[in-house]
């Protein structure tokens, strides 16, 4: 079926849960995309921290095509070689001793919360069901995970919500300690809030949560869906802090654009899960696993991870230079190649407008709420692409400073 597609078709045919850009990308290479009209964009959005190696990376294409020529899917009644290799790679690279594969970050977090409840019920009784999460967090869109995420705008239309979930202020250990007690089964936290404003945790905060969980026999869950797989300059952000969780969720960059998620667990935690307690049709399929295995092989090297840290310094240096010219941002923060620019009060609420102006100038950026412009470029983005993209971003900032959009 040959059909001429326009952006207007989205508004005609798709459920209106997104408001996509007015252009349609049709081709990508590295950190560059081209739309239907042939206009080039430097991609600093990265599919929302997904495209770890940019677009159409040759090694990932080769891994996908090689597996696609063999077989695609069997279901969870059978295992496959790519998923077992990937599991061993993750175990060797992290604290984990067991892995559960799924299709997304939301599914990984759903599995983590279910495991935590079962662990507590089996070991301590059904009274131990409380989950402590944090305001402005984001853990996914299932009913359980959207309830754990501390953003009522995403959950208020779906009441009644799952009970026994309470929220503390992020980076406020005293507030968390008032909620964590012997009825708590788990604490779920992002080492750096992504959707909540690109806000890194303090080391003292995460260390304190670890101590509180140990004291009250609660599991500590790190949601590393956005921060994982090299994004911060370590394979996983927990490695920056020297704080090891009981469970860790990962997705987004793990497949480099091919859908895959995973829950990493210690043997002690994983042992409560038995045949039939949880599952997924597509999780750990050979296509996704082959791509993720190749991506992990490329990313988990000193050269790549050190390169992310170096790129961070160059990126932030250029952003600071832009801010010296236009004064739009009160703070530039983040780790590695997850960077947020917080708007000055004068420009409050204009993050979306800035992202739209950036696209007009030929660079794709993200927002993290109404007041933070977010960057999540490919981990292998070149110096030339950074320079070109931020020159274009500077044009957008100049237009905003001048008082509007063009």
Swiss-Prot record:
Classification via HAMAP family: ArgD_aminotrans_3, AstC_aminotrans_3
> Which pathway?
Amino-acid degradation; L-arginine degradation via AST pathway; L-glutamate and succinate from L-arginine: step 3/5
Per the record, what are the reactions this protein catalyses?
N(2)-succinyl-L-ornithine + 2-oxoglutarate = N-succinyl-L-glutamate 5-semialdehyde + L-glutamate
Q: What is this protein called?
A: Succinylornithine transaminase
The Gene Ontology biological process terms listed for this entry are:
alpha-amino acid biosynthetic process; arginine catabolic process to glutamate; arginine catabolic process to succinate; ornithine catabolic process
Give the source lineage, highest ranks first. Bacteria, Pseudomonadati, Pseudomonadota, Gammaproteobacteria, Enterobacterales
In the record, what terms sit under GO molecular function? identical protein binding; pyridoxal phosphate binding; succinylornithine transaminase activity
Alphabetically ordered keywords of this record: Aminotransferase, Arginine metabolism, Pyridoxal phosphate, Transferase
Q: Which cofactor does it need?
A: pyridoxal 5'-phosphate
User: What's its job?
Assistant: Catalyzes the transamination of N(2)-succinylornithine and alpha-ketoglutarate into N(2)-succinylglutamate semialdehyde and glutamate. Can also act as an acetylornithine aminotransferase.
Which residues are recorded as modified (N6-(pyridoxal phosphate)lysine)?
252
Do the record's keywords include Transferase? yes
Quote the EC number: 2.6.1.81
Pfam families (UniProt xref) = Aminotran_3
Disulfide-bonded cysteine pairs: these are none
InterPro entries tied to this protein: Ac/SucOrn_transaminase_bac, AcOrn/SuccOrn_fam, Aminotrans_3, Aminotrans_3_PPA_site, Class-III_PLP-dep_AT, PyrdxlP-dep_Trfase, PyrdxlP-dep_Trfase_major, PyrdxlP-dep_Trfase_small
Organism in which the protein naturally occurs? Citrobacter koseri (strain ATCC BAA-895 / CDC 4225-83 / SGSC4696)
Family per similarity comment:
Belongs to the class-III pyridoxal-phosphate-dependent aminotransferase family. AstC subfamily.
């Amino acid at each position: 079926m040959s059909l001429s597609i326009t952006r207007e078709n989205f508004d005609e045919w798709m459920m209106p849960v997104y408001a996509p850009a007015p252009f349609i990308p049709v081709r990508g290479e590295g950190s560059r995309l081209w739309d239907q009209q042939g206009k080039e964009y430097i991609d600093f959005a990265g599919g929302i921290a997904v495209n770890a190696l940019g677009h159409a990376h040759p090694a990932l294409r080769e891994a996908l095509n090689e597996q696609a020529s063999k077989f695609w899917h069997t279901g969870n009644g059978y295992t496959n070689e790519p998923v077992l290799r990937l599991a061993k790679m993750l175990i060797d690279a992290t604290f984990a001793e067991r892995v559960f594969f799924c299709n997304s970050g939301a599914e990984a977090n759903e599995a983590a919360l279910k495991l935590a409840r079962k662990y507590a019920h089996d070991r301590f009784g059904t009274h131990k069901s409380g989950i402590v999460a944090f305001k402005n967090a984001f853990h996914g869109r299932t009913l359980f995970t959207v309830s754990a995420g501390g953003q009522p705008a995403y959950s208020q239309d779906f009441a009644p919500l799952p009970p026994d979930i309470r929220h503390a202020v992020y980076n406020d250990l005293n507030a968390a300690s008032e909620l964590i007690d012997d009825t708590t089964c788990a604490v779920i936290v992002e080492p750096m809030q992504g959707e909540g404003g690109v806000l890194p945790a303090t080391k003292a905060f995460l260390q304190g949560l670890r101590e509180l969980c140990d004291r009250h026999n609660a599991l500590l869950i790190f949601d590393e869906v956005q921060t994982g797989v090299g994004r911060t300059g370590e394979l996983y952000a927990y490695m920056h802090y020297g704080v090891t969780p009981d469970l860790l969720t990962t997705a987004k960059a793990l497949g480099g654009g091919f859908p895959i998620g995973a829950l990493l667990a210690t043997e002690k935690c994983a042992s409560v899960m038995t045949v039939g307690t949880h599952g997924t049709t597509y999780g750990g399929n050979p296509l996704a696993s082959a791509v993720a295995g190749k991506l992990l092989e490329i990313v988990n090297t000193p050269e790549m991870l050190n390169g992310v840290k170096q790129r961070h310094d160059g990126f932030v240096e250029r952003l600071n230079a832009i801010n010296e010219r236009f004064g739009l941002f009160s703070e530039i923060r983040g780790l590695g190649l997850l960077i947020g620019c917080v708007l000055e009060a004068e420009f409050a609420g204009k993050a979306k407008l800035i992202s739209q102006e950036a696209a007009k100038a030929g660079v794709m950026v993200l927002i993290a709420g109404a007041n933070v412009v977010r960057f999540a470029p490919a981990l292998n983005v070149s110096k030339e692409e950074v320079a070109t993209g931020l020159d274009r971003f500077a044009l957008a900032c100049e237009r905003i400073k001048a008082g509007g959009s063009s």
